[in-house]
Amino acid sequence: MLLNILAIILVFVISSQSEAVIPGCDYFDTVDISHIPKLNDSYAYEELIIPAHLTGLYTFRQLADGSQEPVKSHLRACICKLKPCIRFCCPRNKMMPNSRCSDGLTENLKRINPYLKITLEDGTIGKYYLLTDMIVLRYEFRYCEKVVSVQEDQYKLYENGSFMIKPDVNWTLSKQWYCLHPRLEDPNSIWILEHVYIPKSMPAVPQVGTISMVGCILTIAVYLYIKKLRNLLGKCFICYVFCKFVQYLIWAGGDLNLWNNICSLAGYTNYFFALASHFWLSVMSHQIWKNLRLINRDERSYHFLIYNIYGWGTPAIMTAITYLVDWAWEDRPDKLNWIPGVGLYRCWINTYDWSAMIYLYGPMLILSLFNVVTFILTVNHIMKIKSSVKSSTQQQRKCIQNNDFLLYLRLSVMMGVTGISEVITYFVKRHKFWRQVLRVPNFFHLGSGIVVFVLFILKRSTFQMIMERISGPRRQQPAS
């Protein structure tokens, strides 16, 4: 009896595993049908009846390079076995659940001549009407190496989904490495976007970002709690840490797919606070250098107002410009290298193409160079002052050296010296060796919330101010 039960369980497990992936079907020929109810052992998808043997449960998402990412178990159907499939691009901010897109492609195709020629396996060429003879699959925009406009006689589309551009040069793309975009102004041509492989992000990024977010919250709370810390520089520091907190919050929400319905809004918000954080770093660099040089440190209220206009106003203007550029060239694939692309590839600005240098890394480079120069001048000024003070004992010299290291480390963080590593990463990101080398400063930047909490909160003077704030002002003892 026990053996029979074990045999039944074994058969069930084997059969379940065999149905997990559809036999003889490429992953990129499948669509998610988990939202479609089963009817008479089949599924209805866009007026097609899909038999059960062409469906299967998938627990992964396959990437273009063949690697897999684990996802929630869902039902997929090998739709391209029933009709030829064609793959059109969809902006990330227009993607809907179950691989749908809200960009109005169907209406646009009706206004042009939506016919495509397909070379079949036997070598014959058939002419297919996109809206009835084919299944239109929607793929998210991915980073593109090339955007090419081809006429009807300049390409061959094969039945297996491969796309040959300009047959005389034999440039062929597999179905997972491209998507199409219609040219409404020229119905006899079409845009083809060749995808590129983007390396996966560093490990433990979500975890480090979440811990950094907590560090930012605690740092802001302490600075708001202790009045002595809320001087002009302290207020600027709070603004900077708040910018980092919002960035970490948006990143964490993106990992949890919370911004799917507001992808563009999340992207522009993240862009604004990313720029603002660098502008506030330059404000603090200027203020530290100014405090060091001036004997009379007069902190008038309008100074902070001016800093606010600069620290928040300039990023707001730049964010408005990026929005207008995206809006003006939204349906122009030939302008992909010129637009910020917020919400196009992901809920963030396009950081792969050289356009990122215009909208993000260019301003960051200018601000980072200013911060580095100011930091060098500040350290040089401090060293000159300290060199005039001679320590009497070796123990005192060692103590001063340790304090100097922490001082310079805190200054480097508050003055944004490490921010230049982001710009360097942009320039060398296509080189595997340098990407690995720059992981250390990138992790330092990613964990800046942890760093500021450790360096500026977990120190003796801050603890003393917290204890004084808790216990209240000390009362003077009366003379006896």
Curated annotation (Swiss-Prot):
Protein localization: Cell membrane
**Topology within the bilayer:** Multi-pass membrane protein
Which PROSITE patterns does the annotation name? Answer: G_PROTEIN_RECEP_F2_4 (PS50261)
Outline which residue ranges sit on the Cytoplasmic face: 226-231, 284-303, 380-405, 458-480
**Which Gene Ontology terms of cellular component type are present?**
membrane; plasma membrane
Q: Name one Pfam family in it.
A: 7tm_2
Q: Name one GO biological process term.
A: cell surface receptor signaling pathway
Q: What's the main place this protein lives?
A: membrane
Record's superkingdom? Answer: Eukaryota
The protein's recorded glycosylation sites are 40, 160, 170
Signal peptide positions are 1-20
The transmembrane segments are 203-225, 232-254, 264-283, 304-326, 357-379, 406-428, 438-457
| S-S bridge residues | 25-78, 80-85, 89-179, 90-101
Instruction: Please indicate the ranges of residues that lie on the Extracellular side.
Output: 21-202, 255-263, 327-356, 429-437
UniProt entry tagged with the keyword Manganese: no
Q: From the UniProt record, which GO molecular function terms apply? A: G protein-coupled peptide receptor activity; G protein-coupled receptor activity
Q: Which family does it belong to?
A: Belongs to the G-protein coupled receptor 2 family. Mth subfamily.
Q: What is this protein called?
A: Probable G-protein coupled receptor Mth-like 6
Q: Which organism is it from?
A: Drosophila melanogaster (Fruit fly)
The lineage is: Eukaryota, Metazoa, Ecdysozoa, Arthropoda, Hexapoda
**What gene name does this entry carry?**
mthl6
